[in-house]
Every structure is written in C-alpha cells, then in structure tokens.
C-alpha cells in the first residue's frame, strides 16, 4: 500500500533512486495505491549526470509493496520494499532494465513491457 507522501525506491536504471508520491491516479479521491497502480511522484534522490534531477515530477507504476496482495486463488504475496518503475506518457518504461522481482499483477494491468524487462515475475 502506497499513499500520499510515501517514499518508494526506483526499480529501474532511469537515473532516479528515491521517489515521493504526490498523487495516486485513477478514481475520485483515490488515496492508496497497490501493485499496478500509476502514481505521480517527485524525484527525491537521483544519480548524478542523468536526465532526471531532484524535484522533477514523473509518473511511475508500483511494482512491489510491503503490504500483502491477495490473489484470486487465495494466496498472498508481499515484498521487502515499496518500489516503482518510471514511465512516460505512452505507458512505456523510461529505463532499459528492471531490478528485482515484479508482481504478476503488473502484467495483468497492462504493463507487459515492464514485466518482460524484469528478471523475475512473481
């Protein structure tokens, strides 16, 4: 579960390291986001000499959450951290690699390119 002002790690090589959530997109007054949701974020930490700078506003897709996710078969899955992948206006990832595992729900919500870049899909 990710909400307003949450800090999340970046799971790709786009140049940002830490993001802060500004808004969870989708729905009227949606306050919490889970795996597969799109969020508007501010870059809090960035790698030097990249296109992304601190304070820049970007969009991202949540790929891992600490809060468990219940699946339709009754199983639960949770991860060690909250992480996201940066996307552009066409819902394509900004980076060329995705680090760490990615939940299967990301593919089901229409981000197949992110799931295909990930080494592990849980």
From Swiss-Prot:
Keywords: Ribonucleoprotein, Ribosomal protein, RNA-binding, rRNA-binding
Membrane-spanning ranges: none
Pfam families, per the entry: Ribosomal_L14
GO cellular component: cytosolic large ribosomal subunit
Any one of the GO BP annotations: translation
Gene Ontology molecular-function annotations: large ribosomal subunit rRNA binding; structural constituent of ribosome
Function recorded in the entry: Binds to 23S rRNA. Forms part of two intersubunit bridges in the 70S ribosome.
Assembly: Part of the 50S ribosomal subunit. Forms a cluster with proteins L3 and L19. In the 70S ribosome, L14 and L19 interact and together make contacts with the 16S rRNA in bridges B5 and B8.
Family classification: Belongs to the universal ribosomal protein uL14 family.
Protein name: Large ribosomal subunit protein uL14
Organism: Petrotoga mobilis (strain DSM 10674 / SJ95)
Gene coding for it: rplN
């Amino acid at each position: 579960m990710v909400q307003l002002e949450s800090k999340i790690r970046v799971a790709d090589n786009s140049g940002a390291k830490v993001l802060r959530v500004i808004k969870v997109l989708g729905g009227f007054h949606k306050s919490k986001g889970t795996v597969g949701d799109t969020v508007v974020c501010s870059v809090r930490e960035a790698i030097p000499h990249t296109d992304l700078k601190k304070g820049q506003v970007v969009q991202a897709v949540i790929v891992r959450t600490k809060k468990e996710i219940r699946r339709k078969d009754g199983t639960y899955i949770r991860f060690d951290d909250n992480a996201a992948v940066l996307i552009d206006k066409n819902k394509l990832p900004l980076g060329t690699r995705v680090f760490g595992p990615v939940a299967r729900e990301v593919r089901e919500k229409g981000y197949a390119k992110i799931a295909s870049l990930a080494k592990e899909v849980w």
